[in-house]
Amino acid sequence: MPQLNPNPWFFIMIMSWAVFLLLIQPKLLSFTHTNLPSNKPLSTPNPTPWTWPWT
């Protein structure tokens, strides 16, 4: 059963995780968010009921 031989795919998996953790992740974490969270209280809108013309 060739899938039990970890020789070809284990190295590829380790290298792909190393690239993700060392190169891609710091670049993604350095981005700033455009909308920072605020402490405003959440207000629920009070919608007016729709008047249907055919009722």
UniProtKB/Swiss-Prot annotation:
It is a single-pass membrane protein. InterPro entries: ATP8_metazoa (IPR001421), ATPase_protein_8 (IPR050635). One of its GO terms (cellular component) is proton-transporting ATP synthase complex. It is found in: Mitochondrion membrane. GO terms for molecular function: proton transmembrane transporter activity. Keywords: ATP synthesis, CF(0), Hydrogen ion transport, Ion transport, Membrane, Mitochondrion, Transmembrane, Transmembrane helix, Transport. Its main location: mitochondrion. GO terms for biological process: proton motive force-driven ATP synthesis. The chain crosses the membrane at residues 9-29. Subunit 8, of the mitochondrial membrane ATP synthase complex (F(1)F(0) ATP synthase or Complex V) that produces ATP from ADP in the presence of a proton gradient across the membrane which is generated by electron transport complexes of the respiratory chain. ATP synthase complex consist of a soluble F(1) head domain - the catalytic core - and a membrane F(1) domain - the membrane proton channel. These two domains are linked by a central stalk rotating inside the F(1) region and a stationary peripheral stalk. Belongs to the ATPase protein 8 family. Component of the ATP synthase complex composed at least of ATP5F1A/subunit alpha, ATP5F1B/subunit beta, ATP5MC1/subunit c (homooctomer), MT-ATP6/subunit a, MT-ATP8/subunit 8, ATP5ME/subunit e, ATP5MF/subunit f, ATP5MG/subunit g, ATP5MK/subunit k, ATP5MJ/subunit j, ATP5F1C/subunit gamma, ATP5F1D/subunit delta, ATP5F1E/subunit epsilon, ATP5PF/subunit F6, ATP5PB/subunit b, ATP5PD/subunit d, ATP5PO/subunit OSCP. This is ATP synthase F(0) complex subunit 8. The lineage of its organism: Eukaryota, Metazoa, Chordata, Craniata, Vertebrata. The gene is MT-ATP8.
